[in-house]
Amino acid sequence: MNAGPLTASTTADIDANVSEVFCSVQGEGPYVGVRQAFVRFTGCNLRCSYCDTPVGKEESCRFEEIPGSGVFSQPDNPLSVTDIARMVSSYGKIHSVSLTGGEPLMHAGFISGLELASPLYLESNMTLPQMAKRIKDKVSYVAGDVKLLPPSAVDDMDLHLENTIECFRTLKATRDRDCFCKVVVTKDTAADDVEGMIGAIAGYISCAVLQPVSQKELLPEPGYLLGLQERMLDHVNTRIIPQTHKMWGCL
Ligand SMILES: C[S@@+](CC[C@H](N)C(=O)[O-])C[C@H]1O[C@@H](n2cnc3c(N)ncnc32)[C@H](O)[C@@H]1O
Ligand SMILES: Nc1nc2[nH]cc(C(=O)O)c2c(=O)[nH]1
Ligand code: SF4
Ligand SMILES: [Mg+2]
């Protein structure tokens, strides 16, 4: 049994460093447009070259009390599970609570202690299988990224791929949980790599989403995305959905 530092302990953590809490609509993937509270944790175990999310401050969180106002209070970190429950319940009729980051699975101990009135929607890089095991019965939605990293970005590529597959196996779609995958596609994304990984996880997901990268200079040609979609359709229901929240300037 693996007993490394990222092996989950069995007790819940009562606090965590959170970079922001806000209310918006889900801007990515098949649930685009549903109203959500977003809880963005600090810290990440990866450094994706295209990442659009700055590393959050550890000292304080920013909390948008009125949705869309652009006005933030700055509660001190760490925040408790009770603080989070109070903040997200203030947002009214939400569909779910998006747990994002950074990498939320680095805070699995805290997530396992959350008791919220709304279902949990996990947004993860799917590379920490021990943490995934710990929270698998807490989350109702899993938006799992497939990270096709260049060899220079990982010490052990086989282990990275195994960890990804193990996360999807653990958090797979069931009667009580939806699980789908997103792949951020850039002009450097190799179709063979995408197809290999999607083939390996197809049995665990309800659909796959090809998400064009937001930086214009990194975008592939439209024909490339359509060709990739056609290949993926051999394995799983596949949609091309760009990030929508950036179109209308919401968080
Ligand atoms: C900021 S990440 C946080 C959650 C987790 N670490 C992950 O990567 O899934 C949230 C989502 O934004 C996507 N994303 C980040 N930068 C992007 C970009 N430049 N263009 C399109 N999607 C991007 C990620 O791939 C992921 O699906
Ligand atoms: N509106 C909106 N939708 C999102 N879906 C995933 C996001 C993320 O950064 O995890 C995100 C985000 O930051 N904003
Ligand atoms: S895993 Fe997610 S948060 Fe971390 S660097 Fe990649 S896109 Fe950004
Ligand atoms: Mg985002």
Description of each model-found segment:
Residues 2-22, 236-251:
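Short, basic/aromatic-enriched C-terminal tail that caps enzymatic domains
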Residues 42-46:
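Cys/His-enriched microdomains
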Residues 29-36:
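Ferredoxin-like iron-sulfur electron-transfer modules
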Residues 2-4, 12, 16, 23, ...:
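Conserved Radical SAM active-site core
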Residues 24-28:
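Short, solvent-exposed loop/turn elements at beta->coil junctions and helix N-caps
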